[in-house]
Amino acid sequence: MPENLGPTAEFPIRNEANQPFSWPAAQPDQGAVLLVHGFTASPWEMRPLGRILQQAGYAVAAVRLPGHGTSHEDLRRRHYEEWLQAVIEGYELLQTGHRQVFGLGISTGALLLAALAAQQQPAGLILLSPFLRLRHWLAPACGLLQYVQAYQERTLRPELIPYYYRYRPVAGVHQINRLLRRVRRELPQITAPALVVNALGDRTVNVASGRHLFERLGSRPKAYHLYGPEVGHGLASPDQPCWPDLISLVLTFLRHHDATETGRSPSVP
């Protein structure tokens, strides 16, 4: 990873669990899955999914988006192009050792994978909690608000404080808005098979815009799944009541498109 994308002496990684990770397949290799975490999170967020995918026969690698896993001050100075570059480099690294690479991302991580897929041709995309609009009505104005208020404070459960930021940089939300403008333009160009998942209980993003994203996707085939109000934004968490069903959806999608690529019959999760 280039020096400008990595941690620095000023902003070191504050917890080893926030480091990027790469795990080989526990069974004969069925391909690889690139995992991309969300805004103000860290690779730790993707570990539960990563372990399940590894045990199912997939090599997995999770990137750390620049400015994440260090400090909110570090994130404040970052641009979405740096995040996207980290995703591109992770994808290209997996490509060198695997016959096919899937992408699985949550929230902003899902948007970054969509931007990647407009340039590359992954074997498939799994987009968890994607969106074209954030829920907060002031989110579109963050380009100006960043000069008035630097951070938005939120409440975190104590056990999550090492892995997520309590303070969200408003400048970072502005970067998400910039990324959204790009993704909106590029969605029709994406052709990789896609699974898109949202939940009615999501209080972070505009859920209807997730469906709109799905409809604009040029992917063929593509599938959309909407969970109910009991399920929230953090679909990568085993604490979600939909977790067993979500794992089944993900594995079925991967195995089907893995079989499509190789000519083998898809196995049942």
Question: Can you name each region flagged by the protein language model?
Answer:
Residues S71-G97, F102, L144:
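Catalytic nucleophile-loop/oxyanion-hole region of alpha/beta-hydrolase
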Residues L49, A192, N206-E215:
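Short alpha-helix in the alpha/beta-hydrolase fold that links the catalytic acid
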Residues G105-L113:
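Gly/Ala-rich beta-loop-alpha elbow adjacent to hydrolase catalytic centers
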Residues T40-R51:
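The serine-hydrolase catalytic nucleophile loop
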